[in-house]
Every structure is written in C-alpha cells, then in structure tokens.
Amino acid sequence: ESAALKALSKGIPVVVLKTGSSTIGSELTISHTGSLSGSAELYEALFARTGIISVSNPSQFLETLKFLCVVGAPKSKNLVGFTCSGGGATMLADYAEKIDLSFLPVDPGQEIELAALLPKIATVSNPLDYTTPIWGQEDLTYPVFSKAISAVEAGSAVLVQDYPAEGLDNSKVFYQRDAIAFAR
C-alpha cells in the first residue's frame, strides 16, 4: 500500500493484473504463491484508495501499459469518445461507466458548430458516433475530432474502431485515415 501511495504521489501509475478473484481461483492462488489472494472486493477497495489501475486479463494489462507509455496518466476521469458506430458509442459509454470514467456532455455553446461538421444523420453526443458518411475522410473527420475535443472538458480522448475482418483489406485505409485524423 505504501509503495502504491508513494508512486501515486509522484504521478507514477501502477497497473495490477489481479487473478484469483473467483472462489476456486483464490484457492489456487493461495496454494501456488499466496500473493494477492483474498476478497476481490477488499483488493478493489485497496486499488481504488491507492490509485492502482486494476485489469482482469493480459490483453487489458498490455493495452493499459501501452496507453500509459504513449499518453501518460489521464489528468481526469472525463473522456471524449469517438466511434463510427452507434452501437460502438453505446458500448464505450457502458464500459466506461463500469470503470468509473465519465463522458461529460458537449458544451451547449459549441453544439451547433459541431453539428454543422457532422452529417445530418449524426447526433451530437459524447461519446460521438460520427457516422459512416464521413468515415475514412480525414479532411472531414479531423475538424469533427478537433471541435469535439475542444467542446468537452476531458482529460483524455479515445477513438474506438472495429478491426477489419480478414479479407476486408480494402477497408483498412478508412481506419488508418480516421486514426491519422484523430492523432493530429
């Protein structure tokens, strides 16, 4: 606990891949190493109190470390999110809420300007489904991303994309263009 608090005070994020949260998993952890075993609720409370980022699988662990290495620790729990799918925006909102992240609304004073950059079928929201009519068109998505980021008080921005299925190689360029526009 003291090491985590010391790291937190220095702005150094700590990420934990906690196993042994099920009854059997906890028993296996105790019999194998005896480390980080016990009530999952107690550990989650400890992690929350000390600022430890808790993940539940190796993919989350690696992606979290990658994010922290590239972007650094978020300055707040507020996000601005983008996806080219209404379902994706909904999933993003649902999952973020589960891990105590927030999507603040778009500043009402900038809503009209953002709406003017979007296709008529789009709804101004955060997270934002910028819709397929402008998907992959960097000259159209960059202004949307830029305006939305400035219109929401957020510590981080996230772009969520579906990975193209095998055989859909022709669509990769659209994903790449949106990623480039987002990264600018």
Regions found by a protein language model. Give the residues of each.
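Catalytic-core regions of core metabolic enzymes
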Residues: E1-R184
